Amino acid sequence: MSGTNSYLAADLNDKRLTNRFNIIVPQLEKGLSHTIPQTSSNKGEMEGVYRFFRNSKVAPDSLISAHVSQLDFTDNSNSLPRFLCLSDSSELDYTGKRLASQLGPLSYLNQRGMILHNSMIIRDDGSPLGLLRQDYIIRKDEDFGKSREREPLPFEQKESVKWLNHFKAAQHLCTQHPMQMVYVADREADIMQVYHARRHKNMHFVIRSQHNRKLHNHPFKLRDLLAKQTIVGTYEARVTHPKTCLLYTSDAADE
């Protein structure tokens, strides 16, 4: 299924906007790595795209939901198909841009932008399937540098709740389709709320450890136990690009 077809099922509850969207998607798909002006054949076409996305009735969640509902989770094999949900955050830096004053701090107070948190679904052979969820986070100036002061806040009010929300979104797919889902995230997702949220037997996770946690009914902590394990094998991950090639080798017991 092409990206265009998966988005054309979107229903914006407005016939005019839905028709406009059906025109815009093929236009943008022709140049996924290009800007809107670059994908537009004239100024009127460009302004039409900008007007569409500025419309308050156009909600990102409705577009992504329509996309997810059209994804093909079937598999030709007789076994239960396995999918990976890759979840991570990126900083969108708009420092020096016209709208920078309306955004929040990033690594330092004068660096202005927003946090983009994506969860991408891929097949276990590495082929991309689609975008599961996307969140934008604009930090407040008054909260900058006060992470310790925010510790007593309810978890739902913390930025790290994004990991839990995306984990739950991935787990929900297990209730809708016959599949195995593996949630993959970096050490920021090493949060007890995420682990406690696992409910479905086909929902799994691979999360890089950040905390040397205590283990249930075991005298050692996590890292102490791993240090005592015998390496049983290694794996290679080859990431290729037309201009670069990266080969990463890791001991199996390290992960």
Where are these regions (language model features)?
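A short acidic-Thr-Gly-centered motif at the start of a beta-strand
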Residues: 64-79, 166-178, 196-197
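Short, conserved catalytic/metal-binding motifs centered on acidic residues
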Residues: 84-90, 182-189, 205
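Electropositive, glycine- and tryptophan-enriched low-complexity nucleic-acid-binding patches
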Residues: 110-175
